[in-house]
Each structure stands twice: as C-alpha cells, then as structure tokens.
From Swiss-Prot:
Tissues expressing the protein: Expressed in ASG sensory neurons.
Compartment list: Cell membrane
Origin: domain of life: Eukaryota
GO aspect biological process, one term: intracellular signal transduction
Sequence ranges assigned to domain Guanylate cyclase in this UniProt record: 953-1083
EC numbers, comma separated: 4.6.1.2
Gene name of the encoded protein: gcy-21
The entry's keywords: ATP-binding, Cell membrane, cGMP biosynthesis, Coiled coil, Glycoprotein, GTP-binding, Lyase, Membrane, Nucleotide-binding, Receptor, Signal, Transmembrane, Transmembrane helix
Organism: Caenorhabditis elegans
InterPro entries: A/G_cyclase, A/G_cyclase_CS, ANF_lig-bd_rcpt, Cyclic_nucleotide_synthase, Kinase-like_dom_sf, Nucleotide_cyclase, Peripla_BP_I, Prot_kinase_dom
Glycosylated sites: 102, 296, 322, 346, 466, 488
Protein's UniProt name: Receptor-type guanylate cyclase gcy-21
Length: 1163
C-alpha cells in the first residue's frame, strides 16, 4: 500500500509528462474537466438577467492561468471548462446534461434558484460548486449531499446586527424592510434576523414593511416616536428605502440630535453599480442618488446625519488593501467578454454590462478551492469521480480568498459567510468625503463561531453626534412613563385638564355617547355566536352530477330529486336521520372534488352518534346548520384561534353593516379553538361555478345578462362601501340565492384571513384558487391584507373579466388551456415582467359571445391596473345586453328548471345504469391496485393492518443495459418498450399463484405466499414464473431496436416478511423485511438470462421436487456478506401439475394457477 501511494505521488509530481493516473479503481485523465452552468445568452442583449455571467469566461481564463503558474497544483493545470448556457437550455436539462457527463469532476456556476439543478446533480452523484446559488441546504433531504455553496448564507446579516446590538447594549429596536422586491433569499434573510432578535430577547418596537417608492413621511414620523435604534434592511435598487427613510429622519432633525442610530443593510446584488463607483461619485455620498434635491437637507446636514449611520452589505472586500485582487480586477476589465469564444461565439456582448465583482471573486475562490481539494484527494489516491469520497475533501475547509481574507466551508458544504461594513467619513488617502468600506465581520476560524471585526486600511471609527452611542430608550420613556409632572404644577395641570374635559364633554356629549355605544358594541363581541346555538346539518350539493345519481338511487325516482332541486340545490337532513339516506351513498362516493358555495366541498359525512366536538372538527371548508330557525352556512377560517384586535373587530363591524341585495348577509362568528367559522346566510342554489360546470344545466342570454348585471352591482356596492373592495372575486364566490340572484361572498376580513394557514393542495390542484387573481396581486409578497384599496379595486376588475370569460365561454376560467393551474399562475405572474406578451385565456372561446363582452373582457384584464376601465365604464359598456329583455330572470329560471326536470326524467334511469357500470369498473380498478382480499376489506370499511407471514418468496427482475438504452433512445421509445414488455409479463403472471407488487423503470417485483398463504408452493410458483418469463423474452421484439434482445436477470429468495397497505392517497401494498432485501441482492448480483436463487429458496424447491437446480457458488453481496447461490435451470411440469391438483383443496389461491404442459429448460 505504501509503495502504491509513493508511486502515485511520483505521478502527481510529474503529471505534466503523463496524460493519466492509474488509481486502484479508476483512471484519471488529464487535463481535468468541469462544466460551468450560467445564463451566458442573457449577456448578449436578451431581456433576462445574466446573474453576473458576462465576465465569467474572461475571469475563468485568468484564474486558469494563475493555477498553471502554481507548480504545487499541476494536477489542475490547463483545466478544460465546458460552458453550458442555461438561458437557451432549461436549468434542469442543463443540470442533467452536466450530471451525466462522466468526464467532468464537478459542475460550477448554476443559477440563483438552483434547488432543482442541485437536486439533479446530487441524485446523480455529481459534485456541484456554485458561486451564485441562494438555496437553503437544509431543504435537501432524501439523498447524499454533493453541493457546495460559495454564496453568502442567510444568517450573515443576523450575526452582524447582533454584533452591534451586543456591543452597544441595545435591547429595543425598530425593524424596517421593503414590502416589495423580496426574493425567496431575502425573505429567509429577514426571517433569520427576526429569529435572532427574538432568541436574544430584543424587543422589536416597530416592524414596518414599506413601499420604497411611496411617500413614507407620516410613517417615519410615527415610527420615530416609538423607537431610537433602527435596523433598515433594503433589497431595492439604489438603496431607495434606506435613503428615503434615513433622509426623512434627517428632515425631522432626528438624526442630528444624536438620539437616533440607523444600522442599514443594502443588498450588493441590487446596488453593486454604485457601491463599486470611484470615491468621487456623488452616489456614494447620497446613498445611490446623484443629488438630494428631493429632500429638505443640505450637504452639511448629511454629514451630521451620517455620523450615526453604519451600512452593512454582503459584497466582496475592497480591492485597495490587497494588490493581488486589485491587479485581477484590472486584468478582468482589460479582457473584454466579446472576445471569449466559447461561450460568446458569433454573438455580441452588451457594452452596458459591468462586472459583478462579487461573482468574479467567488469564481476565483471556487477554482482555487476545487484545485486544492482535488490535489489533496489525489495525493492519497482517492477517487475524485466518486462523489461521496470526493465530497469529504470539499467540506470543513479553509479558503484563502483572492481578496486576501480567509473564508470557511462548514461541514454542510456552505460558506460561513461575512458582512462588509461601510461608513461615511473624509478619507485621507482619497482626499474626499464618501461612503467607504472600512471593516469586515466574520468568523476568525472554522471552530470559533463568534464573529469578530477586522479593520481595513482605514478602519471603522464611529464619530457619534453626541460622542457616545445613543440609548435605545429616552430617559423619560417613549411616553413619559418614567418621569412624573413637575411637583409645583400638578394642581394647575389637574384643574386645567378637568375644565377642558368638562367643556369638551358639554360640546360633544351627543357625539361621544354615540361613539361610546359604537365602541361598547365593538368590545362586546356582538358578532359571537355560541356553538351550542347552532344545530349542525348534513348536506350535499345537488348540482353535482354524482350527487344527483345518488339522490335518485336513494329516493327511487326522479321526481323526488327534481322536486328538491326546484326549491334548493342543497339536500339537508338531521344527523340522526339515518333511515332516509345512507350517508355513505351520498357523501362517500369516491369523489374528492370540492364544490361548496363558499369554496370547495360538497358536504361532510361524519358518523351518526359522534360527539358534538367531533361533528364540528369534521366540517371541511363549508358546512350547514340551523340557527334561530334559519338555515345558515358555516365557512371555515383556517386559524386555530383568533385574537380580536380592534382592527379585526372593525372589519367585522363593517361586514355586518354591509346590507345589499347582491352581497351575502353576515350573521356572526363561531370561535371555539381549534375551530373558527364565519356564519353567513345560506345561498340555496350554490355558486355560479356549480351551475356553469353542470353540462345538463341549459343557459340562455337572459341568464348570462342578469348574472353579469348582478355581479357588477355587487362589486359597485362593495367599492363604495366602508369595506372598499372584494379581493377574492371568482365564480365560486358568486352565490345564487333562492330567487336566482347573484350574491357576492368571501369579501372583507382581510386582516383576519391574512394569517390563515391553508391546507396543502396536491400538485395538480395547486394554484387553482388563484386562476382569477390579477398579476399584481400574485406578485404582491405580503398578502392581501397589506394591499391598498385602490389596487385591490383594480384587481377586482381583472377578476371580473375572468368571471365574464367563464360565464360566456362556459369552459372554465381559462377555457381549454391544457396546463395545470400552478403553471398558468406562474405565467400570468412572470411573462409580463420578462418583457413578453401578458399571458391570458384564449379569446377564441368567446367568438360566439357579443362583441361588447369580448371588448370588455380584453380591456378589463389589461396588464397595467391603471389602464383598466372602472366598474361604471364597464356597466355602461354592457348596458345593451339587458335592453329589450321583457322576461324576468325568475320567469326564465322556472322555465329552465322545467326543461331540466324533463331532461332528468329521461336521463336518470340511464345514469343509474351508468352508475352500476362505473361501480364495477371502480372495483375492478381497486383489485388491480391491491390484492383482492385487501380490496374487499377496504370496501367493507375495515382497517387493513400490517400482517406478518412466516414464509413467502419474493421475485425481482431487471434488464441489464437499460440505462445505456435510455441514454441512446427517445423517451417515447423507452415507454413503449416497457409497456410492451410488462404487458407480456402481466399476461403470464395470471397463470401462477403470485401477486405483482410494483414496477420501477425496468425493475419488476412479484411475490407469492401472500396476502393469502399457500404453504410451501410459493417458491415453486415463483420458480415456474421465472422460467416462463425467460422463455417469453426469447421471442420478444424491441420495437425501436429490432436487432437487440432483452437479457432478463431474475433473483428470488424465500423467508419471513411483513406486508401492509401504506398511505392514504394512492395506497400501495408494500413488503418489508430482510427477505425482500436479499431477493433484490440476488437479482442485482445475478447473471442475465438466469434465475438466481438463494439457499432458503433452494431448500423449499428441493422439498417440492421437480426443479432442476445448479449450484452457482459463493457470491459476495453488499450488506449480506458471502452467500451461496444457485441457478434454477428447468422444471418437470407433470410434477407441478400433480402437486397443484393435490393441494388445491387445501390452498384456495392455487385454483388460479394454470398448469403448463411444457417444461422450460435453459442452457
């Protein structure tokens, strides 16, 4: 071993004379190769963010030249870089290309949002060293980690802020951050800061989230009365929020008093252009602005303001303290990106793009870091192409940065991070007054996690206005609570206040009394309803076609169902009325679709005799009850409890005062933790969406026109009421009452519902409730409660356009668009921002609709909210729809229901037959997914517990060469191949007493002896099945590779096993135990076109008799050690036939085993 290492060291020292190194298990070829993934195409004028990639090729060439000059790193000389343009190739596809490139040792670069890219690389065991990714490594679970992130961590800001708070003993602060432009990374940074402040018992007196471009004067004045120490986090460009807030404090003379201090943070990513400007640039003096003309401040005022301001940033260190870094920056500027081919071949790089020095610094550090780790690994003969081995050399390392500072990679593959500190002062070296980087906060070593300050050439020296740090609390407190009034003036003050109060009471007695009654009413929680006052009812939505079939089957005729439909679209009954309706027949129909009038859900079942608490807990989104003799609707709010603050009580008061024929009536609230419900009047005919989705419900122009008129009338009322807007307009929130009038619901309560914890939707349904939401609200990161009323009103106009599109097109809110809801929502949110045409529904759906409707829809969903028409303009535009119509909506509805009832009488019988047929299909499908005995237990409502089987046999097979076939074939060809092969297999296994467990890619798993035991016949059935499958693949043809043969490899093992149903959605019958693992090892260590058999299975086959078994020998298996293995070569079909006939009476499952007449033998 020692001689091998010495020989390896000799090779490495003389690598320039060799083109490869022979290691123990692999050959390393030189030069080494890496992939670099970045959106290079965005630097050529494309309207997308190049993420600093423009100068990467230039910097890479300089970095490689530096490595070539280092004789200690000869293994990394002449590094071969393959540039992958992610702007032309989707990020995941580019990552997959890099992952499958076996000739590279790592993938560099990646994207900011690199979760999918990193996951693909990790799954494929490819090292990733990213200098731009902003992913949280804690989110990576389920496979070995192979990623290293060189970008700053999200907790760097929190650690730097705590450094200053601890140093000056500040315990009370104000936190200010933008309400817009927050990326996922910025959100995590802010969250980590809040966690750190809370953990260190720092009182957050103010937490303001402001629009950087709005007038914040009043808010700054309000905040200044509540706090003295301000932490301002700004991710906007040109430090708009920090500058605006700070200069407003200056205009109020707060900063000049010396009693205030601002600790500001600006993102280098959005401010690097002016942060890297020369010292004479006015933007460095004015925090990103060229002048201060918009503020009532002078330059001398600014000098006083800046004394109590420290700026933090996540950028790179300055160039001046380090000559090497300064020289590299000069070389990068001289080497123009346009001359770098690849990747800029036959393209022109935009001249306006400036270098991103943070990205370039991280590139140099990444290359040097990867070179050092590779050299260390090869020095001891480690395999650098095996990620789990190589990754150990990449973590817990020190990095000597090109900027002259020391960085650290922790044990999780993430850089420890650092923060640059800026301060305004007059620099002697630059002979100017400006914002200069003066120090750096970071860890001093990998093990010492305490952050310390390191000064640059001109270090941090805070020149406080009052020569000392301000206190976090005024001497007398923020409200004078620490200081009493002067002793001599107490009597005068009391008399004066008393007289003033009496005069005020005399003048405003009537007003105060009215106000008192209003406030008393607010504090009395007048809207609260005792849960015991509501009698819960079962209900189902009869507009559901499945529910109609159930109703008809229960009542035995169409007349009963249609009569109920005339009066209401809900069937309601008492919980204890079990004789009239079988709950399982209506509510447990197997459908998971939701369609209630206040959101999804057709009703809830519940068990007769359940306690009152259980009944309330089982209510999903929507329920029905009886309150004070009237039927009411219960809308669940997804909060475990509610603190009725004054603002929430005011919301509820406005809601109760909203009385209009086109809005739903608010009745009250039921709050008994963990259940919170809003109680409304019940809209008897469900929602507009229920009607539109029912293909059997005929609609005419009168219906559509009247519905349109009602919706606009309801919106007009809300916009002019104290509530001000709707915010959640969609067809499911347009309810239909007994008189066929539209009543809008789910408006108001923006603050109460702003903290709802919504249930997670599945991937297909994710985003479906946002299909009506305007793009500006989709981009609004702080939720509906933080939006201005005017913005939400314009958003209501957009939502109205989608509802009209749905009403007149009757193909849903997005017509026949095939994409999933979440994909539609993503395109609506992002397409316009990327400079593309805004994504909207296909107007071809409305080609048969009136032109005025088409024109209104197009105008109302305009991207710019200010260009959308007002409700008054829309109402005037659509007025011709109702002119000349003499019949009322009720007359039309009565006629419509009569037609609908006649149609039902003809169709119900046919649908009953269809229902029976669908039931049979469902049972057949269930038995295809689960064993028949398990499926029968589930149909009876019984629980299926895990069961232990003393002896069974497990079968695994796969197709060697499948991975290579997948790499060289089209995906559709692979799917056709697997479908053809498994169709043959599935037909064959029907002839044996076996159960197919699952297929994964080319792997096929079968078991025998469970869930119905069959004695020792399980081993024989599996062996016979394997022989039949081997015979079948001899004649099997691969469609796209007709000259290739399937080389099936089979493994089998017998032993004890535990089996049971796992999961609630898409349940699977799964097997557990060492028997399964050993069977898998038999297959993976087997020989193609052979049945590889374990010793335990061989013993059972010997007992059964009739099988030809050949000893293979001892095989080393991972996790199992050395195992004796055998081949099953053939069988005597006569012995099997006699054995099965003899044992069928004893083991019923053998009855499905068909007896083969021919013996299969293989050489």
């Amino acid at each position: 071993m020692l001689s091998a290492v010495l020989l390896l060291l000799f090779f490495i020292q003389n690598v320039q004379n060799f083109d490869k190194i022979e290691l123990e298990d692999i050959t390393v070829y030189f030069p080494l190769k890496v992939d670099y993934l970045a959106p290079f195409g965005c630097a050529t004028g494309t309207k997308c963010d190049d993420e600093g990639a423009a100068y990467i090729p230039s910097a890479m060439e300089i970095a490689i030249n530096r490595l070539n000059a280092d004789k200690d790193l000869e293994v990394f000389h002449d590094l071969d870089v393959n540039y992958v343009d992610t702007s032309k190739t989707a990020g995941p596809r580019a990552a997959r290309t890099a992952a499958l490139n076996n000739g590279t040792i790592a993938a560099l670069g990646l994207m900011r949002d690199c979760y999918i890219q990193s996951t693909i690389l990790n799954i494929n065991s490819k090292i990733a060293v990213s200098d731009v990714c902003e992913m949280d490594l804690s989110s990576v679970k389920g496979f070995d980690q192979t990623s290293v992130l060189m970008n700053s961590q999200t907790n760097s800001l929190a650690k730097s802020v705590m450094y200053f708070l601890d140093k000056y003993q500040w315990k009370k602060v104000a936190l200010v951050s933008p309400s817009t432009v927050l990326t996922a990374f910025a959100t995590r940074v802010r969250s980590d800061l809040l966690d750190a402040l809370t953990a260190n018992k720092i009182d957050i007196l103010v937490d303001s989230r402001l629009d950087p471009m709005s007038d914040i004067t009043d808010k700054v004045k309000e905040d200044a009365e509540k706090a003295r120490i301000f932490i301002i986090c700004d991710w906007s460009s040109n430090a708009n929020l920090l500058r605006n807030y700070l200069f407003k404090l200056g205009e109020m003379n707060k900063m000049q008093s010396g009693e205030y201090f601002v600790l500001g943070y600006i993102s280098y990513d959005t401010n690097y252009q002016w942060l890297e400007a020369s010292s004479g640039d006015q933007r460095l003096v004015h925090l990103g602005a060229s002048d201060i003309n918009d503020y009532n401040l002078t330059e001398n005022d600014l000098h006083e303001v800046y004394k109590n301001v420290v700026i933090l940033s996540d950028g790179p260190p300055p160039a001046e303290p380090n000559s090497t870094w300064e020289d590299i920056k000069s070389q990068v500027l001289m080497k123009k990106p346009a001359k770098m081919c690849p990747p800029y071949c036959n393209t022109t790089v935009s001249e306006k793009i400036t270098p991103r020095w943070d990205r370039i610094k991280l590139l140099f550090d990444s290359i040097q870091y990867l070179a050092d780790a590779t050299n260390d690994a090869l020095n001891i003969g480690a395999n650098i192409y095996q990620s789990d081995i190589f990754y150990e050399y990449l973590i817990s390392r020190k990095i000597d940065s090109v900027t002259g500072v020391t960085e650290f990679i922790d044990g999780y593959g993430a850089i420890v991070g650092s923060i640059q500190i800026y301060y305004h002062f007059s620099s002697s070296s630059h002979n100017s007054y400006s914002l200069f980087p003066c120090a750096r906060l970071a860890q001093s070593s990998l093990l010492n996690t305490v952050w310390s300050l390191t000064d640059y050439s001109e270090g941090l020296s805070i020149d406080f206005v009052n020569k000392s740090a301000p206190k976090d609390t005024p001497v007398c407190g923020f409200y004078g609570e620490n200081c009493g009034p002067p002793a001599n003036n107490t009597f005068i003050i009391v008399i004066s206040v008393g007289v003033a109060v009496l005069i005020g009471l005399a003048i405003a007695a009537a007003f105060l009394y009215k106000r008192y009654r209003y406030e008393r009413r607010l504090h009395s929680l007048f809207f609260m309803i005792d849960r015991n006052q509501i009698i819960l009812k079962k209900h189902t939505n009869l507009m559901s076609q499945q529910s109609l079939r159930s109703m008809a089957s229960i009542h035995g005729s169409v007349v009963a169902a249609s009569q109920t439909l005339r009066d209401s679209h809900f069937f309601i009954e008492d919980y204890n009325n079990a004789s009239s309706i079988n709950a399982s027949s209506i509510f447990n129909t197997g459908s998971t679709a939701r369609a209630g009038p206040f959101g999804p859900i057709p009703g809830f079942g519940g068990v007769t005799g359940a306690s009152e608490d259980e009944k309330w807990h089982q209510i999903p989104d929507f329920g029905v009850g009886l309150y004070e003799g009237r039927t009411v609707a219960l809308k669940r709010i997804y909060r475990s409890d509610v603190e009725f603050t004054r603002s929430i009580r005011l919301e509820i008061a406005k809601l109760q005062e909203s009385v209009n024929s086109n809005v739903i009536e608010f009745v009250g609230m039921v709050v008994q933790s963990p259940d919170v419900f809003v109680v409304y009047e019940l809209a008897q005919r469900g929602s507009l969406k229920d009607i539109l989705d029912n293909d059997d419900m005929p609609l005419d122009d009168v219906f559509r026109s009247q519905m349109t008129k009602d919706i606009i009338a309801g919106l007009e009322y809300l916009h002019s009421s104290p509530i001000g807007c709707h915010g959640r307009l969609k067809s499911t929130n347009c309810l239909i009452d007994a008189r066929w009038m539209v009543r809008l619901s789910s408006f108001g309560l923006r603050e109460l519902r702003g903290e709802e914890t919504w249930q997670q939707e599945d991937d297909v349904q994710e985003g479906k409730d946002q299909l009506w939401t305007s793009p500006e609200l989709l981009r609004w990161s702080t939720g509906l409660s933080q939006c201005g009323v005017l913005l939400v009103q314009k958003s209501d106009v957009y939502s109205l356009a989608i509802v009209l599109y749905e009403l007149f097109g009757r193909l849903g809110p997005w017509g026949d668009e095939p994409m999933e809801p979440r994909e539609i929502v993503s395109l609506v949110k992002r397409e316009a921002l990327a400079g593309k045409k805004p994504f909207r529904p296909d107007m071809a759906v409305l080609k048969e609709s009136p032109r005025i409707v088409q024109e209104t829809v197009v105008a109302a969903w305009t991207e710019d909210p200010l260009n959308r028409p007002s409700l008054h303009q829309i109402k005037r535009k659509l007025k011709p729809l109702t002119i000349g119509l003499k019949r009322t909506i009720m007359d039309n509805m009565v006629s419509m229901i009569e037609k609908y009832t006649d149609k039902l009488e003809k169709d119900i019988a046919e649908r009953n037959e269809e229902l029976e047929g669908e039931k049979a299909k469902s049972e057949a499908l269930l038995k295809m997914m689960l064993p028949e005995v398990v499926a029968d237990s589930l149909k009876l409502g019984s629980n299926v517990s895990a069961e232990s089987f003393e002896n069974c046999t497990v079968f695994f097979s796969d197709c060697p060469g499948f991975v290579e076939m997948s790499a060289t074939s089209k995906p559709i060809d692979i799917v056709q191949f697997l479908n053809d092969l498994y169709t043959v297999f599935d037909r064959i296994i029907d002839q044996f007493d076996v159960y197919k467990v699952e297929t994964i890619a080319d792997a096929y798993m079968v078991a025998s002896g469970l869930p119905v035991p069959n004695g020792n016949h399980h081993a024989g059935e599996i062996a016979s099945l394997g022989l039949a499958l081997l015979k079948a693949v001899e004649s099997f043809k691969i469609r796209h590779l007709p000259n290739e043969k399937v080389r099936l490899r089979i493994g089998m093992n017998s032993g004890p096993c535990v089996a049971g149903v796992v999961g609630l959605k898409m349940p699977r019958y799964c097997l557990f135990g060492d028997t399964v693992n050993t069977a898998s090892r038999m297959e993976s260590n087997g020989i193609p076109l052979r049945i590889n058999c374990s010793g335990t299975a061989k013993e059972i086959l010997d007992q059964l008799g009739g099988y030809e078994i050949e000893e293979r020998g001892i095989v080393e298996m991972k996790g199992k050690g050395k195992q004796m293995t055998y081949f099953v070569r053939g069988e005597n079909s006569d012995m099997r036939r006699e054995r099965i006939i003899r044992e069928r009476v004893k083991f019923a499952s053998l009855k499905k085993a068909q007896i083969q007449e021919k013996t299969y033998e293989f050489s």
